[in-house]
């Protein structure tokens, strides 16, 4: 037991009435009490309020990126906006994406394949981003119609993204890299640890049959190109057959803009010319006649 609570009352002195008036005098010290008279802590009343502050039953969870939990939604929105800006700046050939209207964690996209085994293929897909981005797993990419490919699940249509991004590293990996990877798989076939074993075996053993399967897959995907989106969203990518009334004017404006840009790039920068017109001699110039 703490010696403080064993302290006896030997230090307590008994003074008489006369001793209080006289500065000097005999003082009697009371004998120490028996051990049975030790000080005891008083019992805590049932309705007593503790002095210490109560511990919060559910402490606030701090995100791994060091951002306060209350800033989480704003930080996520800013991160996704920055990611989409990077996608636009990269100008990935044949790849187009559009964030969903209902959720910034879902992006709609389409890939146009212009050459190779999957030439003329138009593959629509959806990107699903984790809600704890960029500290979670890598985004998922799922094709609307499963493509016959070793790295695409033949049932769900999901691309094996983790093959290229085993661990998603914030500030190092970006969504545009996932889109570039999705485009690259159609030009460089990888058959190791496939999600579609049949496609991998055919590519290794019978290339002609693999090509035939790919052609059928491209035709199947293109046949569903005009279908309504599986997810109802105002920003979902929708294709419609060519309508001259609607599309001819837009096509002409696009071509005119492209032509003007090419012409502006071909113009020489204005400045001094060091070659006389009709002459091949450098630093030649026209002689101006001065009138007096």
UniProtKB/Swiss-Prot annotation:
Q: How does the protein associate with the membrane?
A: Peripheral membrane protein
Which region ranges are annotated with the description Disordered? 1-64, 273-292
Matches recorded under SMART domains: UBCc
Q: Where is the composition biased (Basic and acidic residues)?
A: 14-23
Please report the stretch or stretches of sequence annotated as the UBC core domain: 75-223
User: Would I find Kinase among this entry's keywords?
Assistant: no
Tell me which GO cellular component terms the UniProt record holds: FHF complex; plasma membrane
Q: Does the keyword Oxidoreductase apply?
A: no
Q: Give the keywords, sorted.
A: Apoptosis, Cell membrane, Cytoplasm, Membrane, Protein transport, Transport
- What InterPro entries does the annotation carry? Ub_conjugating_enzyme, UBQ-conjugat_E2_core, UBQ-conjugating_enzyme/RWD
Q: Which GO terms describe its biological process?
A: apoptotic process; early endosome to late endosome transport; endosome organization; endosome to lysosome transport; lysosome organization; protein transport
Location(s), subcellular = Cytoplasm; Cell membrane
Q: Which SUPFAM superfamilies match?
A: UBC-like (SSF54495)
Q: Principal place where this protein is found?
A: cytoplasm
Cite the PANTHER family for this sequence: UBIQUITIN-CONJUGATING ENZYME E2 (PTHR24067)
Q: What does this protein do?
A: May function to promote vesicle trafficking and/or fusion. May also regulate apoptosis.
Q: Which family does it belong to?
A: Belongs to the ubiquitin-conjugating enzyme family. FTS subfamily.
Name under which the protein is recorded = AKT-interacting protein
* Source organism per UniProt: Xenopus tropicalis (Western clawed frog)
Species classification: Eukaryota, Metazoa, Chordata, Craniata, Vertebrata
